[in-house]
Amino acid sequence: MTQVYNFSSGPAMLPVEVLRRAEQELCNWHGLGTSVMEISHRSKEFIEVAQQSEQDLRDLLKIPSNYKVLFCHGGARAQFAALPLNLLGDKTTADYIDGGYWAHSAITEAQKYCTPNTIDVKTSVDGLLGIKPMKEWQLSDDAAYVHYCPNETIDGVAIDELPDFGDKVVIGDYSSTILSGPLDVSRFGVIYAGAQKNIGPAGLTLVIVREDLLGKARREVPSILDYTVLAENDSMFNTPPTFAWYLSGLVFKWLKEQGGLVEMHKRNQAKAELLYATIDKSDFYRSRVALANRSWMNVPFQLADPALDKVFLSEAEAIGLQALKGHRVVGGMRASIYNAMPLAGVKTLTDFMVDFERRHG
């Protein structure tokens, strides 16, 4: 059977070791004779899963003790609403950094609950997309918080700078980059991430919230989105997505076994450098992102002749390179190379790209 590499932007590739372990345990988990999908979320067996997965995540990210970790429903889009409902307090505005599609989506949702101060930081120089440096962001004085997305999956635009905005409450949508390398959690009031890229399967959302920000939710916030309610109930106010939680816990263990986030950072850098080098040394492939803002997780690229796009995708699929079609907004190709994608997968892709150019260039 041909080795398959899944370059989907999400739901994304999961580590094969995790999938194999889940397969082995699926019908008889821990000798119980049942699946982990079938046991009560309030059973001592699942509570052990929940507690261990949180501890492994805390170890990986070195999460300070004054932060709560919440395992939530609803995807990152639910957090677009949860954030203003939980954090505005008596204020009516928040700073929203507009760096691309997902940042703008958060702004659109926030408009239902407050008056966002939208700060457009996108740049385009010589046809290359980029982001203004943080020192040029014009933040307001009275905002409840500052929200930004450090990695835009559609355009492949990244913000590698870490925020240093004094005592401002900073919110980061880390859906596509969390666990791809070390992260100083203490710089943020809230970090949130949908699971389906670097954490686990779709259906789970991670929220890391500083404790002093709890207790400020509006009266009308739905209980399932209230950070204080979720924290007080250990993320079990209602039945959580237990199988997604279990699988995410296996991913956390896998990351620790691989050497942690410093090691993942090295691997991700090597993968991205190989792919970008293949693009840059060719006139056949093109990147539309400025060097300073290229994503390590999502690499869009275009062919010089778009008429060859369908041929490229068809031939790639035939040799096991799946889900390379770019987002409809951008077109072309996109390779998402999250933690679970091995260097061998990227090497197979770049070898194919070189051969495709030789035959069609």
Curated annotation (Swiss-Prot):
Main location (coarse class): cytoplasm
The protein's Enzyme Commission number: 2.6.1.52
Protein name: Phosphoserine aminotransferase
Pathway: Amino-acid biosynthesis; L-serine biosynthesis; L-serine from 3-phospho-D-glycerate: step 2/3; Cofactor biosynthesis; pyridoxine 5'-phosphate biosynthesis; pyridoxine 5'-phosphate from D-erythrose 4-phosphate: step 3/5
Annotated function: Catalyzes the reversible conversion of 3-phosphohydroxypyruvate to phosphoserine and of 3-hydroxy-2-oxo-4-phosphonooxybutanoate to phosphohydroxythreonine.
SUBUNIT field: Homodimer.
N6-(pyridoxal phosphate)lysine modifications at: K197
List of residues binding pyridoxal 5'-phosphate: A76, R77, W102, T153, D173, Q196, N238, T239
Catalytic activity: O-phospho-L-serine + 2-oxoglutarate = 3-phosphooxypyruvate + L-glutamate; 4-(phosphooxy)-L-threonine + 2-oxoglutarate = (R)-3-hydroxy-2-oxo-4-phosphooxybutanoate + L-glutamate
Cofactor dependency: pyridoxal 5'-phosphate
Organism, as annotated: Serratia proteamaculans (strain 568)
Binding site for L-glutamate: S9, R42
Family: Belongs to the class-V pyridoxal-phosphate-dependent aminotransferase family. SerC subfamily.
GO (cellular component) term, any one: cytoplasm
Cofactor remark: Binds 1 pyridoxal phosphate per subunit.
Subcellular location: Cytoplasm
GO molecular function: O-phospho-L-serine:2-oxoglutarate aminotransferase activity; pyridoxal phosphate binding
A GO biological-process term: L-serine biosynthetic process
Catalytic class of the enzyme: transferase
SUPFAM superfamilies in the cross-refs: PLP-dependent transferases
Annotated keywords: Amino-acid biosynthesis, Aminotransferase, Cytoplasm, Pyridoxal phosphate, Pyridoxine biosynthesis, Serine biosynthesis, Transferase
